[in-house]
Amino acid sequence: PATAIRVLLAAVLPCAGFYLPGVAPIEYEKGHKVDLKVNKLTSTKTQLPYEYYSLPFCQPDNVENVAENLGEVLRGDRIMNSHYELKMRVEETCKILCRKELSAAEMKEFSVRIEQDYRVHWVMDNLPSATKYVDETVPSKPVTIYDLGFPLGFKGSADIPGTKEGVGYLNNHLLITIKYHTDESFEGARIVGFEIEPSSIKHSYSGAWKNGDTQLATCGGSAPSTPLALDKPGEVVFTYDVKWEYSEVKWASRWDTYLLIGDEQIHWFSIVNSLMIVLFL
């Protein structure tokens, strides 16, 4: 018992990753499919998690629970498959995920969750998604900070061009950046980073909707896009970019990034990790 207590106390210090025996690195050849899995929605305001598909997001034909290890179960994760299509080192620009006609009630569901500061959590290759920020409080010493997940949306304000005060805006376009590492000691590439940069775009197009072949007029332009307001029922087009970046970080060190997560998230992340360490003693 004394040993367990000492380990627990040591583990509640800000830490991020944990390693479960039997979890081995996966090597992906160029062009091979990489699964992007959706997880829960969480908020530090409510502490009440929701399943990802509790909101009217794009869904695959068959939604399946795909939790892979005990750690995910202990964290209360609700991991499911997704409709996103990614291939190792194959980049995408403004790829259409789906188009949905949302009712006033569905728009309000999104808006309420945004008001409650809900964040979306995804998983790729057993890594949770993260959003990167640069803290420039001290201009001469900028600090990179990561937050787990990414914001579902934001509330409009006078400081945000093209928005109305108090109206909710949905982050329907996502830049997915995956960092990979290669080495002579193995074939293919290993995933060592998974970042999301969300944005809100009211997409437009000419002519009839042609599913994935539709040419969106709101992609690739130099002019600022209009954010997608949730103030009335209507069309929502979900899109995403995929970017691949080589990294010197090795697979065994890929969790080090999560040492830079924000203070509020460090607290809960550390407690859960500590409990798992004690259980595995």
Kindly give the residue locations of the regions a language model identified.
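Bacterial N-terminal signal peptides that target proteins for export
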Residues: 1-5
